[in-house]
Amino acid sequence: MAPPGLPLWLLSTALLSLLAGSSAFLSHPRLKGRFQRDRRNIRPNIILVLTDDQDVELGSMQVMNKTRRIMEQGGAHFINAFVTTPMCCPSRSSILTGKYVHNHNTYTNNENCSSPSWQAQHESRTFAVYLNSTGYRTAFFGKYLNEYNGSYVPPGWKEWVGLLKNSRFYNYTLCRNGVKEKHGSDYSTDYLTDLITNDSVSFFRTSKKMYPHRPVLMVISHAAPHGPEDSAPQYSRLFPNASQHITPSYNYAPNPDKHWIMRYTGPMKPIHMEFTNMLQRKRLQTLMSVDDSMETIYDMLVETGELDNTYILYTADHGYHIGQFGLVKGKSMPYEFDIRVPFYVRGPNVEAGSLNPHIVLNIDLAPTILDIAGLDIPADMDGKSILKLLDSERPVNRFHLKKKLRVWRDSFLVERGKLLHKREGDKVNAQEENFLPKYQRVKDLCQRAEYQTACEQLGQKWQCVEDASGTLKLHKCKGPMRFGGGGGSRALSNLVPKYDGQSSEACSCDSGGGGDYKLGLAGRRKLFKKKYKTSYARNRSIRSVAIEVDGEIYHVGLDTVPQPRNLSKPHWPGAPEDQDDKDGGSFSGTGGLPDYSAPNPIKVTHRCYILENDTVQCDLDLYKSLQAWKDHKLHIDHEIETLQNKIKNLREVRGHLKKKRPEECDCHRISYHSQHKGRLKHKGSSLHPFRKGLQEKDKVWLLREQKRKKKLRKLLKRLQNNDTCSMPGLTCFTHDNHHWQTAPLWTLGPFCACTSANNNTYWCLRTINETHNFLFCEFATGFIEYFDLSTDPYQLMNAVNTLDRDVLNQLHVQLMELRSCKGYKQCNPRTRNMDLGLRDGGSYEQYRQFQRRKWPEMKRPSSKSLGQLWEGWEG
């Protein structure tokens, strides 16, 4: 029989061994963290690091070794990360709300950027508001929105350190929890990158000390590498030979196959190229402080033991270009260098060192942050959470070694600006259908018999002419027009005097009857006032009229109507003379007119004249030497552009003088500003009953006048500042030796460069999948671009002419769907079977039939054999 104390001793030994094993289990760092996190039910911390204007295509991430070690080697790298708009404030608004630009209505860096409308409708629905209401300690540090003025603290943020207005590194103002705080130019206390890094670290440590069980959300929004590109002093000597920005598209200009600003941007001058080199160098220098900031935040997470319970996201609001396609600097283009951004994620269950090829967008950040926090994603957010793309610990069937590809989007929308509202006089029911290319429409018209004769038919207005290169063109018939009773004759009969084709001037008959006649400028003005009614007289000359030819609208200036003494008629050497001049009596119905003496030839340029018979004659060298012809044509184009700018300025001044005209004194009129002013007020309307309907038009007129005055103020301001760089319709800048205040300094003097245009409004479809990699863009001007990035990764050639009409039509339909989408269900098209497409010879229609979705009712392109593909299409 065993001693009675033996079982007790064995029991105590077993108990001690179990306690030692449990202690060893808890000593393992990973298991300890997971055990404690599950026990305490702590949600993960979230840190979003956002940079301003940071590119991927120009190699900015190559110098950030600390960030790449922390985020790329320790987390997931999304190699196909894009923004849906390459503009600061619109993109940041999309990041906050998870919506496309057309759904949060912030189209530019000025319009609706931090406006009262934005504050009321969208700022109250940012991801910070949702997380703050569920217990997160939320904090924002750095640049917010371009037009944020610091007058309030946006909702959803417990700690707020927001930068007023645009990015700066020194001499800026912060709004710290509602109190404005000015900073100077001392690096140790004022350098923005270091300041917001230190503030964010201090906030995180304090939050974990005071509220250890509450998760933290922090947004650290850096100004780098945005201008003015002021680097920290210790980095001002780095990268003297930076050349990552010199890509195949660098200084690739002009580009006649691209949209307007690209066509008129020439190669850069040497001073511009030197500026791009220094700009790239200074941008990289500013990013070194961001690199240090990432290391500081990482070390803080390690010290506090929160690294394994924190998601870190690193990205930018959009990309940048430096010298690409001849553009000295800037953003706002739909190309890869402006829409691709860095995108890294590190956190729990994220596979370290992984590359993810799925498309992620800036509108995915808000849904992802909500998903990480365990919150439901609102249905009005257009983006979707990428958390399921990161989870590496979900169980996988061991009998299926090859993972099934996740269903994800393959296309997205890139948009900039908005389409201006049409005038009331424009077409209201404009068909949403595509047109054939212009050359095809002209070719079809030239097949008709009425356009194949050389202006010989009665009432013929156009003729088809084949130029030296074999291209068919529609030319307006010169000489007197023979109206055949069409509507066009009635429309012009009120403006064109019905005289003989040899003279549109009034006959000044002497008492003797048949002499020559001449009529000076003053006489012609009197005749015009006498012959025409007041309703047809205008103070401003009519610029153009729209002439319709078989359903096609051609805008033709009235000065091109064949009238004698018209100095703007086109002329080609060797063109046949009109044979209809001798038969002019039938046109006017007034019989023949006596002959008159014609004026002498008019000298237009130093090499070209307008002869007595209204024809243009130039030196023979221009018809023989191609180089001489080009040089003279460029000279004429320059003169025309100069005169147009001068005319525009004169019209602005004329409008100003009309508004500031002094009133004439009427001694018999009772002064309105008298002591009986109140008794003189009319209780009813003073307008004539026939004039009451014009009140709405008067309001429109007042709005136009306000715009006119605004333009005039800008013009006067430019003149006062001696600003010769600004050009109408272009966004230009002047750089000089005083722009950069920190080393390295610019010493090569001032220069001017233009970076964008007012008509640079577009909507693009970007698609990446196993069979396609393209960019399809429609511009507000009607221009279309298509780039196949599989064969042209730098988008050097517009390949829209290689597409069939059916493919163009399908691309247009898909783009229109995305332009009107709302919510993640509509805004995330995906392919159900990526193996189907053009690889096996199938059509694009077969490829798209797997992406059919239910969309709101909208006008679809018609299936006409001929006609426009869509309104505004330009081949």
Swiss-Prot record:
Assigned GO CC terms: cell surface; endoplasmic reticulum; extracellular space; Golgi stack; plasma membrane
Residues annotated as signal peptide: 1-24
InterPro entries: Alkaline_phosphatase_core_sf, Extracellular_sulfatase, Extracellular_sulfatase_C, Sulfatase_CS, Sulfatase_N
Residues annotated as the enzyme's active site: C88
CDD domains, per the entry: G6S
Positions of modified residues (3-oxoalanine (Cys)): C88
Ligand binding (Ca(2+)): D52, D53, C88, D317, H318
Cofactor notes: Binds 1 Ca(2+) ion per subunit.
Organism: Mus musculus
Native organism taxonomy: Eukaryota, Metazoa, Chordata, Craniata, Vertebrata
Residue ranges of the region described as Catalytic domain: 1-415
Record flagged with keyword Glycoprotein: yes
Gene this protein is translated from: Sulf2
Keyword 4Fe-4S found: no
Region (Disordered): 560-595
PTM description: Processing by furin produces a secreted form. Glycosylation at Ser-588 negatively regulates its N-acetylglucosamine-6-sulfatase and arylsulfatase activities.
Keywords: Calcium, Endoplasmic reticulum, Glycoprotein, Golgi apparatus, Hydrolase, Metal-binding, Proteoglycan, Secreted, Signal
Reaction(s) the record says it catalyses: an aryl sulfate + H2O = a phenol + sulfate + H(+); Hydrolysis of the 6-sulfate groups of the N-acetyl-D-glucosamine 6-sulfate units of heparan sulfate and keratan sulfate
Site note Cleavage, residues: R543, S544
Region (Hydrophilic domain): 416-720
Membership in a protein family: Belongs to the sulfatase family.
Protein name according to UniProt: Extracellular sulfatase Sulf-2
Glycosylation positions in this chain: N65, N112, N132, N149, N171, N198, N241, N539, N566, S588, N613, N722, N759, N769
Subcellular localization: Endoplasmic reticulum; Golgi apparatus, Golgi stack; Cell surface
GO process terms (BP): bone development; cartilage development; chondrocyte development; embryonic skeletal system development; esophagus smooth muscle contraction; glial cell-derived neurotrophic factor receptor signaling pathway; glomerular basement membrane development; glomerular filtration
